[in-house]
């Protein structure tokens, strides 16, 4: 079984413990014999322009034993529901690269609806792959949910 693991937030060079639970869960699945590939849309806020000196776009590394594909770029349309369309296209690039390099995906496991779960749903529906979302907050009552986001969450 091959799981594409989509975290909504994840460790990075500026915050090594961000999403540590997600990484631990993926590692435990891998230790249990499951093939796990992490697909992370690493979104940078516009306030970080000039402060981040990493290459934008798709990259691959083995991080703590996990095959990790990242798509790194800024959120050019923050706090606007259109950003989800951009996120979905980035996730699709990650998905296609993972399938090309690692083989077909049997199941997608997203951690939290915002933001990874939205893109996971897009990929799941477009490519007919079963999806599991582990939620970590009350999405409908959460402080980050705008009315314009609701159609993407449901």
Residue ranges of each PLM-predicted region?
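A short, flexible beta-alpha/helix-coil linker loop
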Residues: 9-12, 74-78, 138-141
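Soluble or luminal CAZymes and related metallo-dependent hydrolases
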Residues: 17, 21, 83-91, 152
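Nucleotide-sugar donor phosphate/pyrophosphate-binding loop at the beta->alpha transition
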Residues: 17, 127-132, 138-154
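Short amphipathic alpha-helical segments and helix-helix/interface helices
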Residues: 23-27, 121, 150-154
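A cross-domain feature marking catalytic cores of carbohydrate-active enzymes
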Residues: 40, 110-112, 133-135
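An aromatic- and histidine-rich active-site surface loop
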Residues: 84-88, 105-127
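A conserved catalytic-core segment of Leloir-type glycosyltransferases
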Residues: 38-102
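N-terminal subdomain of nucleotide-sugar transferases
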Residues: 1-67
């Amino acid at each position: 079984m091959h799981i594409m693991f989509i975290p909504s937030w994840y460790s990075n060079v500026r915050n090594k413990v961000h999403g540590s639970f997600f990484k631990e869960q993926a590692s435990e699945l891998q230790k249990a014999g499951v093939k796990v590939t992490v697909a992370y849309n690493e979104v940078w806020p516009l306030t970080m322009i000039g402060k981040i000196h990493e290459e934008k776009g798709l990259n691959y590394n083995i991080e703590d034993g996990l095959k990790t594909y990242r798509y790194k770029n800024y959120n050019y349309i923050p706090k606007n529901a259109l950003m989800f369309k951009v996120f979905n296209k980035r996730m699709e690039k990650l998905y296609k690269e993972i399938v090309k390099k690692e083989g077909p995906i049997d199941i997608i496991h997203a951690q939290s609806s915002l933001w990874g779960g939205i893109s996971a749903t897009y990929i799941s529906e477009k490519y007919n792959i079963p999806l599991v979302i582990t939620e970590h907050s009350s999405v409908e009552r959460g402080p980050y949910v705008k009315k314009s986001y609701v159609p993407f969450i449901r």
